[in-house]
Curated annotation (Swiss-Prot):
Modified residue annotations for Phosphoserine: 147, 272, 333, 440, 503
EC number: 3.6.1.62
Function summary: May play a role in the degradation of mRNAs, both in normal mRNA turnover and in nonsense-mediated mRNA decay. May remove the 7-methyl guanine cap structure from mRNA molecules, yielding a 5'-phosphorylated mRNA fragment and 7m-GDP.
Protein name stated in the entry: mRNA-decapping enzyme 1B
Taxonomic lineage of the native organism: Eukaryota, Metazoa, Chordata, Craniata, Vertebrata
In-chain residues carrying the UniProt-annotated modification N-acetylalanine: 2
Encoding gene (name): DCP1B
Entry's family note: Belongs to the DCP1 family.
């Protein structure tokens, strides 16, 4: 009685399970076997390891009233997604306690873990028997010429569609990596078309001839699968051999893709009638010079681009020439304040000529908003030392140029290296050739060429970038060795012959243009023009000013007598200078207006007295 009751409970439980299964598949008619607790694992081809899925529950093996006749389902208790697999001839099972491994028609490998080993062995035996039955049935059906999938006319449509879908997907997954080219059918659109370019067939190599028949072997009407025994082997080598099959498929894909490449190259060659490899060497030759230029870019740069005048300015102002040298005295030091009035007048007049002659000239074409050159900054410092604070030697751009003026260089080497500084500013003050007024560019070019020839006679053995530094004249020097460089005339007149060394063709394009100088430069020249004429420091228009400077840092070496002559400004030149300054310098006009008001107040005071 107890056994009958137990059998009734089991039968009742199976009826409930069958009803639940029929909700998902109405063609299920009987449950063959049950495994109480299983878990599903999948094999990852990329990671070559097993991964646990979220499918876990009871496994049911059942029969169906439609094809496929058998199948199994894992009723998932973790989620609503169940695992259903039809048992067909394409399934391949292998038992490895407590796992039952199988591969389906989609070449996916799964492992079913059983809580009970007896259930694992029983279900594995049942699965193998059902698979063999399906294979035998399929073999007999194809031999007789009758499809075993159609049971009756009512169910034939659905069964045929399911079978066709499974078979089409199976063939697609097996043949998608085939490299065998498709055979062109004998169509009139292909053979009778005169505009069609037909590729010339290329004879494959021996290795390709051996590889090409291999895909043909897999294109059978009935695809044959590798067994899990060949995949996984025995139990002791199961985990190692499971990883063999997916890499083999990837390797076959790579081999088949490599087989495609020579054939495609031959077709391209026949279509383009050119060797593809002939295009590659010119590409390399085009790329190599660009890379070489990038590699040796610093060697191709012009040496003048590294000079301090060409470097970016800090705070929007160019540093004066004195900031690039290390010496005991600077242009803006308080020692410059005590110089004579005649020297100041000469420097102001010289700067006035620089402004007059740089404006109509063709050399100065830059934006006036750019920083002033070193000579103009030095004049501003020497004229109004109270308005400019001298900078420390370590500020700004002083550090890179200091490499030129170390103590290891000889005196002439110092002069050569320092000559590059004023030579950079030739487009700015190159018109200071000694003319007493505004001269034409043709006359300026002639004078520059004459000066260059004379300088080359005296310094023929010097490098191309080094200018000749004449020695200091006795008339402008004082008792101290560096007094000539400290004075305001030296910062202007010393650079005058240096700017005449290079011809306009060799002027670098990176030289900085000049700005309008400080109005303090023109504060007193308007009130004392006779003293400027009496100072005797203005050069004659047709003569070259003699050597009046030595190296900017070195003491006097061999003084020579001075040959400086002067000529006064004409009324027309003075008128042009005043008109230019009034029109272009607001500060100059303000100074004149202040002087006018001061004279008017003094005249009123004298009348009142």
């Amino acid at each position: 009685m107890a056994a009958v009751a137990a059998g009734g409970l089991v039968g009742k439980g199976r009826d409930i399970s069958l009803a639940a299964l029929q909700r998902h598949d109405p063609y299920i008619n009987r449950i063959v076997d049950v495994a109480s607790q299983v878990a599903l694992y999948t094999f990852g081809h990329r990671a070559n390891e097993w991964e646990k899925t979220d499918v876990e529950g009871t496994l049911f093996v059942y029969t169906r009233s439609a094809s496929p006749k058998h199948g199994f389902t894992i009723m998932n208790r973790l989620s609503m997604e169940n695992r259903t697999e039809p048992i067909t001839k394409d399934l391949d099972f292998q038992l490895q306690d407590p796992f039952l491994l199988y591969r389906n028609a989609r070449l996916s490998i799964y492992g079913i873990w059983f809580y009970d080993k007896e259930e694992c062995q029983r279900i594995a035996e049942l699965m193998k028997n059902l698979t063999q039955y399906e294979q035998l049935k399929a073999h007999q059906g194809t031999g007789a010429g009758i499809s075993p999938m159609i049971l009756n006319s009512g169910e034939g449509k659905e069964v045929d569609i399911l079978r066709m879908l499974i078979k089409a997907k199976d063939e697609y997954t097996k043949c998608k990596t085939c490299s065998e080219p498709k055979k062109i059918t004998s169509s009139s659109a292909i053979y009778d078309n005169p505009n069609l370019i037909k590729p010339i067939p290329v004879k494959p190599s021996e290795n390709q001839q051996q590889r090409i028949p291999q895909p043909n072997q897999t294109l059978d009407p009935e695809p044959q699968h590798l067994s899990l025994t060949a995949l996984f082997g025995k139990q002791d080598k199961a985990t190692c051999q499971e990883t063999v099959e997916p890499p083999q498929t990837l390797h076959q894909q790579q081999q088949q893709q490599q087989e495609k490449l020579p054939i495609r190259q031959g077709v391209v060659r026949s279509l383009s009638y050119e060797e593809p490899r002939r295009h590659s060497p010119p590409i390399e030759k085009q790329l190599c010079p660009a890379i070489q230029k990038l590699m040796v870019r610093s060697a191709d740069l012009h040496p003048l681009s590294e000079l301090p005048e060409n470097r970016p300015c800090e705070n929007g102002s160019t540093h004066s020439a004195g900031e690039f040298f290390t010496g005991p005295v600077r242009p803006g030091s308080p020692h410059n304040i005590g110089t004579s009035r005649g020297v100041q007048n000469a420097s102001r007049t010289q700067n006035l000529f620089e402004k007059l002659q740089s404006t109509p000239g063709a050399a100065n074409k830059c934006d006036p908003s750019t920083p002033a050159p070193a000579s103009s900054a030095a004049l501003n410092r020497s004229r109004a030392p109270t308005s400019v604070t001298p900078q420390a030697p370590g500020k700004g751009l002083a550090q890179p140029p200091q490499a030129y003026f170390n103590g290891s260089l000889p005196p002439q080497a110092h002069g050569r290296e320092q000559s590059t500084l004023p030579r950079q500013t030739l487009p700015i003050s190159g018109n200071q050739t000694g003319s007493s007024g505004v001269i034409s560019p043709q006359e300026l070019l002639k004078k520059l060429q004459i000066v260059q020839q004379e300088q080359q006679l005296h310094a023929s053995n010097r490098p191309a970038l080094a200018a000749k530094f004449p020695v200091l004249s006795q008339s402008s020097g004082t008792g101290k060795p560096l007094e000539s460089w400290i004075n305001k005339t030296s910062s202007t007149e010393q650079q005058t012959p240096l700017f005449q060394v290079i011809s306009p063709q060799r002027i670098p394009a990176t030289a900085a243009p000049s700005l309008l100088t400080s109005p303090m430069v023109f504060a007193q020249p308007t009130s004392v023009p006779p003293k400027e004429r009496e100072s005797g420091l203005l050069p004659v228009g047709g003569q070259e000013p003699p050597a009046a400077a030595t190296s900017l840092l070195l003491p006097i070496q061999s003084p020579e007598p001075s040959m400086i002559t002067s000529s006064p400004l004409t009324k027309l030149q003075l008128q042009e200078a005043l008109l230019y300054l009034i029109q272009n310098d607001d500060n100059f006009l303000n100074i004149i207006y202040e002087a006018y008001l001061f004279s008017m107040t003094q005249a009123a005071m004298k009348k009142s007295m």
